[in-house]
Regions:
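Intrinsically disordered, low-complexity proline/glycine-rich segments
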Residues: 1-178
């Protein structure tokens, strides 16, 4: 069942509006439910998990709480295990417009983000090329908490899940900075 989630490259993310935890559903372009995401009840140092329809965790993202800048550590699967560590999403310390990037475990810059975090309209770049676009307009959504993610169809499954996690954390950042 996670195959549906892993192979998808066009997503619609729908956040549950009335929820004590950050949670929502992940749909494909045909509006078929293919996964879920959710955080914890206590928001400090939150941990988010993307799960397939069998509730199997595909990706875990842990918010780093003792840090000068916002940062999130990404792990494959459901545990915060060093052997499954994929990298970290960081935010530039001082910037008029928030600036984010993703580094692998060796601190190599893998993805950069360009756009407006406050409207959730931005592009994710890898080696200078656009590999994903995030926008409410992609899905003609006027509902708060609904947005589309369109990825390059040639992206590998691991990169696609990383980008999905990055998008969820950018949404979390946007909500935290309201």
């Amino acid at each position: 069942m996670s195959e549906q989630l892993l192979k998808c490259r066009e997503f619609v993310l729908k956040e549950k509006m009335i929820s004590l935890t950050d949670k929502g559903e992940i749909f494909n372009a045909n509006n078929e439910l293919i996964g879920t995401f959710r955080g914890k009840l206590i928001k400090i140092g939150n941990t988010y998990r993307i799960r397939d329809l069998n509730e199997t965790p595909v990706l875990t993202v842990a918010e780093k709480i003792i840090s000068l800048r916002s940062s999130y550590r990404f792990y494959k699967g459901g545990e915060k295990d060093d052997s499954q560590y994929l990298g970290i999403l960081k935010r530039k310390l001082v910037a008029i417009k928030p600036s984010y990037w993703f580094e692998d475990p060796n601190e190599n810059h893998v993805f950069g983000m360009k756009g407006n975090i406050f409207t959730l309209k931005f592009k994710i770049l890898k080696e200078g090329n656009v590999v994903a676009e995030i926008s409410k307009k992609l899905w003609k959504s006027i509902l708060r908490g609904h947005y589309g993610v369109k990825m390059n169809p040639d992206l590998d499954d691991d990169s696609a899940m990383l980008i999905l996690g990055i998008v969820l954390m950018l949404h979390h950042e946007k909500e935290e900075n309201r």
